[in-house]
C-alpha cells in the first residue's frame, strides 16, 4: 500500500471515529456520535470493550451558557471529559466530582446507596481553559462546582466525550437512565434541546488532526520494521512494560526516546484522565501463547446491582488486547469482576490467537484468556498485539497502582 493510501485511510479513521451511520443504540442531536465500544462499528482510539462512549462536537457562541442535566447511571463509573483537536484530554468531570440535585443521591460517593431512584445532577460547560489542573488518575480533593471546561480549538470547535464504565447487569449501554439532556441560555432565552443543537451546530464535522486517533500507518510500519532491529521489534521476551505519557514517549517504545517530564495521558487517542495506563507489545514469533500472572487490585463490586458503593484500592481495572498504534482497534477486554482469582488474589491470563487458546484457559480452571487478532497489528504483521492495563482513580495509600509509577525506570519496583 502506498503512502497516499495510508494517509487516506487514516483520514477516514479520523473522520469516522465518532460516526454513527448504521450503529445501533441511543443517541440524540447533541450526543450524536456513539454509542461505540469494542464493536465492529466504531472500534478506534483504544476503547475498553466494557465501556460505552458518546461524543458531542459543537461550537458555543459568545455569551451562550450550556447546561447538561442527567441522572447518574447504574454503573461502575461515569464522566464527561473535554478534548483538544489532537485528541488530548483537557479536563475530566468524573461522577464523584458532581454534586447531585437537592434531595438526590450521588451513587458514586463512598458509602452511598447505588440504587436510590433520586439520582439527578446538572452541570455547566464553559468555553474556556481550566485555571487549575486536577490530579489525574487519583481521587481529587478539589471541588468542581459542577463545571466542565471545554475550550474551543481550530475552527471554534469543542469536543466532549460521555463515558459509562461497566453498566450494571442488563442495563447496557446507558446504565438504566437516559442520555443527559441539554439546554442553552442565550440572549435572554432558554432554548430546548433541538433549538440548542441548532445554535451549537452539533451536527458539524469533526475537525481534529490526522494523528489524534492513531499513528499514521506508514509511520507505524517504519517504526516497527527498522533495518537494524530484530523482526520482533519492539516486543521482548519477557515483555517490557511502558506507562502512557506523551506522544514522544509513545513513539519512544520504538525509538528509546522517552520524555519522563511529560504529564500522564497526553499522547492523544482520547484517553481518560481518571485512568493511568500500562502497556506492552507482544509478538507471537517468541511463542504462540503469552502467560501473565499478577496480584489483582481490589475494586468495588457493582455489576450485579450491589446496593452500596464501597470505595476500594481502585475504582476499576481492566486488561485489553489491542491490535496496534497503527489502527488502535481493541480485540477484547476483561474487567476486574470477571477475571478469576486464586485464593491469594492472583490472576493468570493467557493471550493467544484463538487457534492456540489453551484448553484450560477458562474460568473453571482459574485462567483468563484474551485474543490476538487473526491479522495481528492490522497493518502488516500478523503476529503483533498490544496488551494494556487500565487503573482508575487509585487511592493515595495504594502503593501498587500504575499511578504510583513516576517514570519508566520505576515500573519494576512498583
Predicted regions and their residues:
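N-terminal signal peptide c-region/cleavage motif recognized by signal peptidases
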Residues: 14-16
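Sec-dependent signal peptide recognition
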Residues: 2-9
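A compositional/structural signature for long, glycine/proline-rich flexible linkers
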Residues: 20-414
Amino acid at each position: 500500500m502506498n503512502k497516499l493510501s495510508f494517509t487516506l485511510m487514516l483520514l477516514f479513521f479520523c473522520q469516522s471515529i465518532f460516526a454513527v451511520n448504521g450503529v445501533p443504540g441511543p443517541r440524540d442531536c447533541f450526543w450524536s456520535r456513539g454509542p461505540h465500544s469494542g464493536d465492529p462499528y466504531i472500534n478506534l482510539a483504544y476503547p475498553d470493550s466494557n465501556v460505552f462512549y458518546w461524543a458531542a462536537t459543537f461550537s458555543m457562541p459568545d455569551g451562550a451558557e450550556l447546561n447538561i442535566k442527567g441522572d447518574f447511571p447504574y454503573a461502575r463509573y461515569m464522566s464527561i471529559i473535554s478534548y483538544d483537536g489532537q485528541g488530548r484530554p483537557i479536563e475530566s468531570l468524573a461522577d464523584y466530582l458532581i454534586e447531585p440535585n437537592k434531595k438526590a443521591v450521588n451513587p458514586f460517593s463512598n458509602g452511598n446507596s447505588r440504587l436510590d431512584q433520586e439520582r439527578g445532577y446538572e452541570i455547566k460547560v464553559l468555553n474556556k481553559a481550566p485555571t487549575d489542573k486536577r490530579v489525574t488518575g487519583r481521587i481529587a480533593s478539589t471541588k468542581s462546582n459542577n463545571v466542565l471546561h471545554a475550550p474551543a480549538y481550530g475552527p471554534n470547535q469543542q469536543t466532549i466525550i460521555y463515558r459509562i464504565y461497566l453498566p450494571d447487569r442488563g442495563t447496557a449501554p446507558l446504565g438504566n437512565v437516559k442520555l443527559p439532556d441539554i439546554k442553552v441560555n442565550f440572549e435572554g432565552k432558554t432554548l430546548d434541546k433541538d433549538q440548542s443543537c441548532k445554535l451549537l451546530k452539533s451536527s458539524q464535522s469533526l475537525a481534529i488532526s490526522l494523528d489524534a486517533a492513531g499513528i499514521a500507518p506508514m509511520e507505524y510500519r517504519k517504526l516497527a520494521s527498522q533495518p537494524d532491529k530484530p523482526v520482533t521489534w519492539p516486543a521482548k521476551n519477557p515483555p517490557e512494560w511502558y506507562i502512557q505519557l506523551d506522544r514522544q514517549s509513545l513513539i519512544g517504545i520504538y525509538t528509546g526516546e522517552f520524555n519522563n517530564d511529560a504529564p500522564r495521558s497526553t499522547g492523544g487517542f482520547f484517553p481518560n484522565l481518571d485512568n493511568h495506563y500500562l502497556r506492552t507489545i507482544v509478538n507471537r514469533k517468541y511463542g504462540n501463547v503469552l502467560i501473565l500472572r499478577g496480584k489483582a487490585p481490589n475494586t468495588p463490586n457493582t455489576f450485579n446491582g450491589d446496593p452500596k458503593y464501597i470505595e476500594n484500592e481502585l475504582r476499576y481495572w481492566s486488561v485489553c488486547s489491542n491490535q496496534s498504534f497503527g489502527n488502535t482497534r481493541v480485540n477484547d477486554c476483561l474487567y476486574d469482576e470477571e477475571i478469576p482469582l486464586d485464593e491469594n488474589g492472583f490472576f493468570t491470563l493467557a493471550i493467544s490467537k484463538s487457534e492456540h487458546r489453551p484448553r484450560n484457559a477458562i474460568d473453571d480452571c482459574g485462567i483468563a484468556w484474551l485474543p490476538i487478532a487473526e491479522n495481528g497489528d492490522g497493518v502488516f504483521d500478523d503476529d503483533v498485539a498490544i496488551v494494556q492495563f487500565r487503573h482508575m482513580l487509585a487511592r493515595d495509600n495504594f502503593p501498587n497502582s500504575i499511578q504510583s509509577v513516576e517514570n519508566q525506570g520505576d515500573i519494576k519496583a512498583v
